[in-house]
């Protein structure tokens, strides 16, 4: 292709591009070795992509790029990319070239390529520790997922439309990946990862087959259950508590399940993910090429083990090791100290009057911490008021379910007692669902107390202004969340950007009833004593039409190191917590170094409307969402967080990790919520999971010679 490259170089308007292309063509013409030619082509393709916008001949440039990609594909087919005959160092050099080619054809962004290069640079040594070798290979395994998600950003919505008339349209993205330089990148990486696992004495398995790439542990844990798709789980009449569910990476709600298998990358900081992590529900990311192997076993009972060190086993349940059936210890149940609660206060409380001492007393932890943020970071928290537990409690007791009958609270207590005596699971589920429907109906339909409604309206005007002049997020805030053993993240309802007093009152009814939805009840019920003592406060938080928003954990979520923060952020409002494919970053708190974990590839973003509600509009798809200035503001905020959670015991408070929801508008940081980041300890106590990781510790000091082939041969 050298003459074709030179011909294009003669046409382009940008002199710098022309010089670089001619030099690249000259180098290419003098090479015969396939690997060396792939290296030269990768460099030319990367430079061509950067230069096409200023070339003056973009269509010809794209035609040339397609021709060069075909050359790379043909050359790579001549190499033994997955046979293990190429040395570790040469394999990594080829991966670098293929990543540049992937960048050239638009599958990777410059930020993604820079992060791949940085990881490869850490491996560019004569020898290095096994731990470094393994961790960098694991990081490099993210790149094919980035490429797949970049294609999804551009083509996911058109594919969904076309698939209605031609189902084969759904195969476009995997087909494009198989025809791209990234397929050879993956095939080179796989034997290296298998090599690292063999050196460490561990292996990843899916139904008896050892795999290098394609499985990544998000949450540690052990589960056994029937393998279902999300559609099958949602259509199931019986409980899904015994199901292991294959879910799309963008899911925002999930019924109670035993285990989660997430397609492609996933969002490690979404509400669903944080809830699963808190409850010890294992979650494994499964790359697209492995999904067909999973789908063969739909409807069968399987076993999933995911260790803290990232080792994953997926087997048929009948093939599960006997040692894996061990009990992981009893589930710690939550008991509510009702005596400390203030169930009498019924006036709306401005956030400026709230603090940590009110959490679980007058209001839930969400409102209490928003009050704390309001007072300590003035100007960075939008105005808010809380509807206290007292209003909800009075709604339970001030009227009777039937004339002369019990109050709703008394009726619920009787119902819960009766449910405890039912041994048949199906009958218990049926009765529970009937009870929950009755409670929801009570809140949605009961006549309002005119005097209380008038006081409520006046309080809204005093705190927010005239009716219709503002919007609020109406957020559930119960006494059964952000506790030591249960976060409850995302379980109950938030109604976004409600405009108008009548609409706010209607949203209040929905929020009060939301803890009695089957999904919230299912996740909560198994870990709670005295379930009749669920009380709901409501946070009314003035809307901020954020340009970007996300979630921050003040630690490395994977390792637990407090030297880092982990971020997931999207354009628009709420994408990070909803589970959209987010920009995920790991940031060093000491020097601000940024490491990319995943790019924001959701094709749409949510924006708020002045009339209420929101709409989805196209996202920009820019390579980066957070700017360096944004990151600097977040790091400054984090510096003030040590010792934040005043209700914790002193020893725990000093090392507590925070889970923060935030946004940016006009370059300014806004704070929406802060809670403790709570992980489940049962997985760390499992001797079987410890055994899976044993080789990692035993072989941590091994040295890897990079000139050798995978397996240790020269």
What are these regions (language model features)?
Residues 1-172, 221-225, 287-539, 626, ...:
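N-terminal beta-alpha lobe that positions the nucleotide/phosphoryl donor
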Residues 174-294, 299-305, 311-323, 353-375, ...:
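Conserved mixed alpha/beta core segments that line enzyme active sites in large multi-domain catalysts
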